[in-house]
Structures are given as structure tokens and as C-alpha cells.
Amino acid sequence: MQAKSIQAQSIQERLIVGLDLPTVREAEQAVRELDGVVSFYKIGYQLAFAGGLDFARELASGGTKIFLDMKLLDIDHTVAKGVENIVKMGMTMLTIHAYPKAMRAAVEAARGSDLCLLAVSVLTSMDEQDMIDVGYEYDPHTLVLRRSEQALHAGMGGIVCSAAEAEAVRRIVGPDMAVVTPGIRPAGSDHGDQKRVVTPAQAIRNGASHLVVARPIVAASDRRAAAQAILDEMRSA
């Protein structure tokens, strides 16, 4: 069984802006400022637990694509029931931690829907020392590739990984699965808490299907110009 993947038709559809903002009011303002430039948004924990789930439904009902970044991980039954309800919300993408049983449960629960399930491989904020600290025997690159194979075999629609690993991941998963890359930073920008970062153009060249960009856009003084500059860089790849 294969979960639905997603094929972007334009560069604009390949840019996902992370609404990493504390309130729905601020997120609404960001969406207004980006109207006509951005058509795909990510909503994660910060906004989700401040009324962002209702906001996600509202945006989705109007045709905006929403990537719900929940990184689900629990026993199979709990993951499946969560996915079943998220399917009803009309979301475009949903993240599941790349544990085989959780992924298989999610794929079964999303069967027949348009929800693209993304396997979270290794957080882009983690480096090799972080992996050692939490007890993994693999370095980030090796674990990303292992989990990419597991996601493919589980029938997931895509994989979330650093753009630094996107080229190797693409070779494993083939041309049809989504390869979604956070940790994107324009050349010369602050890396923040991200450790494995890549520029927008390099991410596209490495085989990423979608780029997730938050702070470089939502924290910019001119969000619209910041988003347009990243789109222009993506087009130059």
C-alpha cells in the first residue's frame, strides 16, 4: 500500500512557509502579507496549540495547502486514530516519526485520502554529538538513509530530511516520493538553532521537492520581499 504523494506544479507550490508564530492573529497577518506569493503553509506545535488547528481548517477550506507538522509517534492504534481525524481536516501533508510500525499504521489510516504522509528522519537541529547523546549508534546521514528505506517500504508519501541529505535520499526513494527539506537558509542569513542547513538553490539542485522556510520569511521586516527572494533563488537552481 502506498500513501498519496504530492507533485508540485510550480516553484511557488514548492515553497512551504512555516507559520512559527505565537498567535493566530499574527499568523493571519503573515498570510495576508504573503497572499499571492505563497500558497502553502506549515503549522506546527507553537501555533497548533494556540488555536492554530481551527486556523488550519479555515485555510484549507479556502484552498490553501497546509502541512500539519505534528510528528506523530505512539502505539499503532493511537497513531491511526489521530491520522483518521486529521484526514477529515483536509490537510495536505502530515508528519509521522519514521518508526516502521507507526508509519504502517498511518498509511493504513490514510488509505483512499489525499493526505500526504511524511516520515521525519532526523531533525535538522541534530548533529552527530546529539545522536550520541540520545543513544543512537548511527551518525545523522546514515540514520536518514536507513529511515528513508523504511519509509519507502512502509508506503509513505514522502520523507523529511536535511537538504544536505536530499540527493542521497532521492536516490533511495526514487522520483515520485516527496522530499521535504527544512533548515533552509538564504546565503548569509543566521542559522538560528539549525545545524545542517542548505541554501534554497542548493536544496532544489539536491533533489528536494518542497522547501520549508520559517524565520527567514516570517521574521523579516518585509515578508513578501523575503519570500519572493527565496522563490527567485529556487528558480535559479
Curated annotation (Swiss-Prot):
It holds the Pfam family OMPdecase. It catalyses: orotidine 5'-phosphate + H(+) = UMP + CO2. Keywords: Decarboxylase, Lyase, Pyrimidine biosynthesis. The keyword Lyase applies. PROSITE patterns: OMPDECASE. The active site is at 71 (proton donor). Pathway: Pyrimidine metabolism; UMP biosynthesis via de novo pathway; UMP from orotate: step 2/2. Substrate binds at residues 20, 42, 69-78, 124, 185, 194, 215. One of its GO terms (cellular component) is cytosol. Its EC number is 4.1.1.23. One of its GO terms (biological process) is 'de novo' UMP biosynthetic process. SUPFAM superfamilies: Ribulose-phoshate binding barrel (SSF51366). GO terms for molecular function: orotidine-5'-phosphate decarboxylase activity. It comes from the Bacteria. The keyword Lyase applies. Catalyzes the decarboxylation of orotidine 5'-monophosphate (OMP) to uridine 5'-monophosphate (UMP). Belongs to the OMP decarboxylase family. Type 1 subfamily. Homodimer. This is Orotidine 5'-phosphate decarboxylase.
